[in-house]
Amino acid sequence: MWGLYLVDVYDNVTCLMQAEGEGYICPILVRKTKTPPSIPDRVKLNEKEATFFIQDIYEGEGLKGIPRGTVKSLRLHAYEYAYVKTRSDHNWHGIQSGWDIKRMLGTVPVEEDGSVIFKAPANTPISIQPLDKDGVAIQWMRSWVTGQPGEVVSCIGCHEDQNQIAIPKRVIASQKAPSALTLPEGGTRSFTFDLEVQPILDRACIACHNGEGKAFDLRGGKKDKLGYGTSYLNLHPYVHRQGGEGDMVVLQPYEYHPNTSELVRLLKKGHHNVKLTDKEWKTLYNWIDYNAPDKGYFNANVLTDLPYKGFDQIKRRKELTDKYANGAGVDWKKEIADYADYLKKQGPITPVMPEKAAPVKEKTLKVKGWPFGADRIKEMLAKEKETRKVVEIAPGVKVNFVRIPAGEFVMGSYRGEPDAYPTAKVKIDKAFWMAELETTNEQFNVVFPDHDSRFVDQQWKDHVVQGYPANKPEQPVIRVSYNDAMEFCRKLSEKTGLKITLPTEAQWEWACRAGSDQDFWYGDMHADFGKKDNLADKTTLLFAVYGVDPQPMAKTNPWYKYYTFLPKEESVDDGNLVQVGGKAYEANPFGLYSMHGNVAEWTRSDYVSYPYNEKTKETSEYKVARGGSYIDRPKYAASHTRKAYYPYQRVFNVGFRMIIED
């Protein structure tokens, strides 16, 4: 006799079932119950699109600190992934570019309250970039989302926490029908350098950059043995971007804004009077936002090995995607070919020689007693009651200040970039205190303990660390906005009773020059800076790395010439790859360290036209950062060099230096 019994903790035994000559293996108790309500299918196989809803794009970590109203639209692109036994490594599409094809799907508008609703292709890996008024990506979505046919996919904001819940509020987008994609001119297609960027170069650049003379060649049509175009190889070194594999944390908004790229800064400052159209600017921004790719296609092989012998991979992928993903297959090769035909129909491009800019009328200004040397500085400081001040901002955390005397000098330079002139006589009416070093991570964390300067990007792939540390206590703080820096100064002022703030452009340049009328306090543009400051030098070659846990490449490595692309002054060795803390270099005659390099520094001045006038009523949406950094060549790190960034922009190589005003 075999039975099934229910036994409780009190040793009560209840027989549920008995049978003679039979046994029960893995019995399951069942009872009659009412069928529960089923969740209706949310997929509508008769549709080819999904609906995407974002309640508030400004919610979440992705757009932290970005003012409401900045996001005007979303740029959508889809990924097309690699094929079997096809060259598709991280450097196939470009140098420090990306792994996959990026197909431009189009843009959709964002409502005033940050909400957005739109339709996009279903069964398609889609990535989203929020754009500002200029068509620049404020943030990069380095993953993707896939909607099923007819599904409504929603999120709260930009990179919101997975535990965050939606805010119970009515938004503009929820009261509207979903927006349709505004397709790119010429249709959906992969972004390729030859068809997107090269036409800009053909019109605006190759009249000069034609392979003749000193200007590097920007003509299209020439490829090296790896398939990289000559114009691409010559242009991409001047673009700041992350690369195929980078730090996985959410990026700072505008981390790779085009204004952090030398190429864009050069053009914005009027490079030989070259003028781009709005469309060309947006295309250039798009290229940078996509990590500056070259190819944008795969040379997928027809397979020769069993069991797939004879398959055309591109054709076969489309067939299978159409069959199993509700017709979502993509013929990206045809899209590229169709756009090439579209461009041909626009007619040949005529290179435009820029109009010669009006000659600069240099006005020689002289100031009595300037320039001056170290002996004069000693005389000036001898009139001050104190020349050094130490401020303890937290137990054991001190800031050393040096006295900067009052005086008059010629601000700006005709040897500099166009925004550095006309020059002006500027008088610093009152002496002030300036920190001898840039504000450090340790000091900044006194007020903002959660701030992390994180890391400097590492090239190549297969990283085992996030990059080169930038968050050591003694290193200068970076990725702080002008607003952050001013708030830091404000809170320290409240705490210490001192008037701590940022310098004006005039105060900064006066302090940096320390009596010099040259490009640097130690000489002209060609002076050896090895012991003076941390700039883009011979050590910049060490950014070219290779292998798992990438280490500096050997010169014999075939990739060496491709990855030593960062502009640099190889004749000088300053001994450091990235920013460093402490007094690693010589101080200028005022006792200030690293004024020209290490990291650039915020000032409290608006980025307005010269000649400099402290009383000007002209304003700007940008603030000025002064000096250069470990990644800048001397020509972009002089005492008169100006860089313009949004006051809420946290820049990868910009920190700040405090002053105290009496």
Language-model segment annotations:
Residues 390-457, 480-483, 597, 662:
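A short glycine-rich, aromatic-capped structural motif
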Residues 67-69, 91-93, 231-235, 253, ...:
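Short, polar loop/linker segments at the starts of domains and inter-domain junctions
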Residues 410, 414-415, 462, 466-474, ...:
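Functional-site microenvironments in short loops/helix caps that host divalent-cation chemistry
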Residues 1-113, 119, 138-154, 165:
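Sequence signature of WD/YWTD-type beta-propeller architectures
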Residues 21, 29-34, 43, 66-71, ...:
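Aromatic- and Gly/Pro-enriched helix-to-coil junctions and flexible linker segments
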Residues 40, 86-87, 129-131, 140-141, ...:
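Short, solvent-exposed loop/turn and secondary-structure capping segments
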Residues 652-662:
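Short, structured beta-strand segments at or near domain termini in extracellular proteins/domains
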Residues 369-403:
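GGW-centered surface loops in extracellular recognition modules
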